[in-house]
Amino acid sequence: FVLILLQKETGSALVFMAFLLMFYREGMKGIVLLLGALAIVLFIVVIRFSIETIGNEQGSWGVVGAIAIIQLIQIIVPFSSHPHKKESLIFLGLSVLVIVASVIINKWYPVDYNYVAIGTSLVTAIYWAFTGILRRYPKLIAVAFISIGSLVFIYASDMIFNHVLEPHHQIRIKVLLNMEDDPTGAGYNVNQSKIAIGSGGLWGKGFLNGTQTKLKYVPEQDTDFIFCTVGEEHGFWGSALVLIIYWLLLMRIMKIGERQKESFHRVYAYSVASILFFHLMINVGMVLGIMPVIGIPLPFFSYGGSSLWGFTLLLFILLRLDASRLERSR
């Protein structure tokens, strides 16, 4: 129904209306056709006759009102079928909350009607997915989650990039995706880091013999970009050895977590492994130019007392939890 409202041409809206006939033939109630007809009417009245005012308050409120009507009908119909089920009550409350939140957001922070439509229809889409076709075909749940997540990401990424991220964040992402070449500005650190790692070759230039690092071409080489020092001085094999040591540490932490009997101890062990893994992945990734530069330390490697203390305390607490398990088993 929301797709009908989002169309810019009447013909496209009628095509989506035709899909409702297929849903009706597959077993949905006749109300689905009524909702489709109502969506067509609202499309013509709100979109076509107020196309000049879509960007301002009047057009936005018209679209929000039209979508709210569609949403309320879709909420009331399934709720009336199962008024006493707990899941129906929860869904009713969440749906009304989403609609009210969308109206409030549109009042204080006007957005394009596409984002309003996606936000107000998200809860209903999930509800229909779980209570309709997916109950008959449980294996499609993962596919539905991926599809819904992809659609939300497509519509939300542009708004987040333009309205949430700061200008310097946007430049870093553009440099990462090769959308903007700035070797002397935002891309300088990554460019020099890749030169240092590439010049190291297989065996490296030797301990303290790196040219890019020792001549200070690579900024922050003691903290955020310390991995490029390893790559330049010790080459591919030295870098691989460091990554293998990290892998052994993560496997050891996971093994400790697997043998814990209490849920909290297991969750804590997995959390420690996740923290170390993401720090390692992001730090090494940004040094190699495959991750945006966000200034994250390499665990137990980067210079800095606070990060060293933080990671050490995480491991100390994990070892103490494991020791308490051994004490209780005696």
Question: Predicted regions span which residues?
Answer:
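Transmembrane alpha-helix interface/packing and boundary motifs in multi-pass membrane proteins
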Residues: F1-Q7, I197-W203, G231, I282, ...
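A juxtamembrane structural motif centered on a specific transmembrane helix
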Residues: Q71-V77, E87-S102, N283-R330
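Hydrophobic core segments of transmembrane alpha-helices in multi-pass, intramembrane catalytic enzymes
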Residues: S12-F23, L35, A39, V64-I70, ...
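Interfacial segments of multi-pass membrane proteins
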Residues: L14-L34, Y127-W128, Q212-G235, L298-G304, ...
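Selective detector of the "anchor" transmembrane alpha-helix that sits immediately C-terminal
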Residues: W237-R252
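Loop-to-helix entry and N-terminal half of a specific, functionally important transmembrane alpha helix
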Residues: M254-G295
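Alpha-helical transmembrane segments of multipass membrane proteins
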Residues: F1-L3, L20-R25, V100
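Hydrophobic, glycine- and aromatic-enriched re-entrant/interface helices and adjoining loop segments
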Residues: L38, F43-G238, S263-H265
